[in-house]
């Protein structure tokens, strides 16, 4: 019998996997339509346009991650409030966070448009790439608010016990992006203009569509819009809770720029294009872990708010086993599929194909460990300990990766760039283990 799973339930391995299935599929599908986007740009607009898109992408993602921060941090706060039994307050907090995200989205859009050109130059855009960077970046930036709201609602659908509805909006947005990529880029030959247009239309579906659902008080979920009651303390708490996710995404943008700089220095535009392919593929594999962590987080927050320590122990134990098995499976799959996946993107250029395949095989070693580090950070966010979560993310995604990217290429050349993420994940695993052991008595997991 397929009964509805609730946050208050006792979770077995199969039950938590069922509950996390929708956010996992949601994240995987998001990565798939990003891959399709890259495929059409690379194969129909050329590797120069593909390199330009990947060069400006870190800047665009840096602004969009505000929605991810408020979504993950805010959903942890709202889920904990639901766990205490105060549903009215939970809806007030939810409504306030949506309004705050929309306002911040408008502000950041204006700022991003003003600094887009100097940012592209700073990221290393050459004269050949600059115009394409500006064109793609401008179209995406104008609709940045929808992008932020899309990330926000992905987290809150899980908290509202409506993960399948969140999946529906993600699939609808993704299919729209894929179809429009085919029409705009493949058929009409609009190049990166068409790719950008396809992306923003899909973001409008994913970011604006959920508002119609949450506007209905009797929507069947735990959350709906009410008159927002502003609370600076609650907003700060949500930001603190989600600071690790903000740090992860900001660091990813900075590290991505640093990767591109090193790759331009050692491999030229081909190096940047190869990195773009590896990022698309790695996001697909990492999305499984991210989706699982997103699915578990509201459950952890709820039971933490309800002071159910036995269930916290159970959730942590199950999750570590699931991640260990998943890491081994992903490593095997990524090594086996490195060549065919590289050929899918850059099969038209033999030299670029060889570079991409080797880079992907080395980079894929990180999949064995990254799941533990992704979950560890999300676990502390769910416990409303944003500081520990942020420290883990800061060290993992910024300090360790930046150090590795700056040092390893001098020792190993181009291979050192691909192995930088592996070194960072190994170091982060020790940090994660330290904090899990250190805080065990405090949270009684």
List where the protein language model places each region.
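Short alpha-helical transmembrane segments in multi-pass integral membrane proteins
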Residues: 1-23, 78-145, 187-243, 300-366, ...
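Alpha-helical transmembrane segments of multi-pass membrane transport proteins
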Residues: 14, 29-30, 67-68, 108, ...
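Transmembrane helical elements of multi-pass membrane transporters/channels
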Residues: 18-37, 139, 173, 202-206, ...
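Helix-terminus/linker motif at the lipid-water interface of multi-pass membrane proteins
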Residues: 32-50, 120-127, 183-190, 246, ...
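Small-residue-rich hydrophobic transmembrane alpha-helices
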Residues: 50-110, 147-166, 274-338, 370-392
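Hydrophobic transmembrane alpha-helices of multi-pass small-molecule transporters
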Residues: 62-65, 109, 177-182, 207-211, ...
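Short runs within selected transmembrane alpha-helices of multi-pass transporters and secretion channels
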Residues: 71, 139-158, 166-177, 195-210, ...
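Membrane-water interface regions at transmembrane-helix termini and the short interhelical loops
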Residues: 153-161, 181-193
């Amino acid at each position: 019998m397929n009964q509805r799973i609730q946050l208050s339930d006792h979770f077995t391995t199969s039950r938590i996997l069922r509950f996390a299935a929708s956010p996992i599929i949601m994240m995987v599908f998001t990565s798939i339509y990003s891959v399709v986007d890259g495929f059409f740009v690379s194969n129909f607009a050329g590797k120069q346009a593909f390199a330009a898109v990947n060069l400006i992408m870190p800047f665009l993602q840096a602004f969009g991650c505000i929605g991810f921060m408020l979504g993950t941090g805010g959903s942890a706060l709202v889920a904990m409030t639901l766990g205490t039994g105060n549903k009215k307050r939970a809806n007030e907090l939810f409504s306030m966070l949506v309004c705050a995200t929309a306002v911040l989205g408008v502000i950041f859009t204006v700022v991003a448009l003003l600094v887009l050109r100097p940012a592209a130059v700073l990221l290393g855009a050459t004269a050949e790439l600059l115009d394409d960077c500006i064109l793609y970046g401008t179209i995406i930036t104008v609709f940045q608010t929808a992008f932020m709201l899309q990330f926000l609602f992905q987290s809150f659908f899980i908290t509202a016990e409506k993960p399948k509805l969140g999946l529906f909006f993600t699939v609808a947005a993704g299919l729209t992006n894929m179809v429009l990529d085919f029409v705009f880029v493949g058929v009409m030959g609009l190049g990166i203009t068409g790719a950008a247009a396809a992306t923003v239309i899909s973001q409008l579906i994913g970011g604006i569509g959920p508002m119609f659902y949450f506007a209905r008080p009797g929507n069947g979920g735990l959350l709906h819009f009410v008159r927002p009651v502003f609370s600076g303390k609650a907003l700060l708490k949500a930001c603190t809770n989600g600071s690790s996710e903000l740090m992860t995404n900001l660091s990813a943008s900075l590290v991505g720029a640093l990767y591109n700089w090193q790759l331009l220095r050692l491999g030229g535009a081909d190096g940047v294009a190869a990195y773009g392919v590896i990022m698309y593929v790695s996001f697909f594999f990492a999305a499984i872990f991210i989706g699982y962590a997103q699915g578990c987080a509201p459950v952890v927050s709820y039971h933490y708010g309800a002071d159910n320590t036995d269930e916290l122990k159970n959730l942590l134990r199950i999750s570590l086993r699931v991640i260990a098995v998943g890491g081994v499976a992903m490593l095997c799959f990524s090594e086996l599929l490195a060549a065919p996946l590289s050929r899918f993107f850059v099969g038209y250029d033999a030299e670029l194909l060889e570079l991409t395949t080797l880079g992907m095989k080395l980079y894929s070693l990180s999949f064995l460990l990254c799941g533990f580090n992704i979950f560890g950070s999300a676990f502390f966010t769910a416990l409303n300990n944003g500081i520990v979560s942020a420290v883990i993310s800061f060290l993992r995604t910024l300090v360790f990766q930046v150090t590795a990217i700056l040092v390893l290429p001098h020792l190993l050349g181009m291979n050192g760039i691909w192995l930088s993420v592996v070194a960072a994940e190994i170091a982060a695993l020790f940090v994660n283990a330290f904090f899990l052991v250190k805080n065990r008595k405090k949270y009684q997991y």
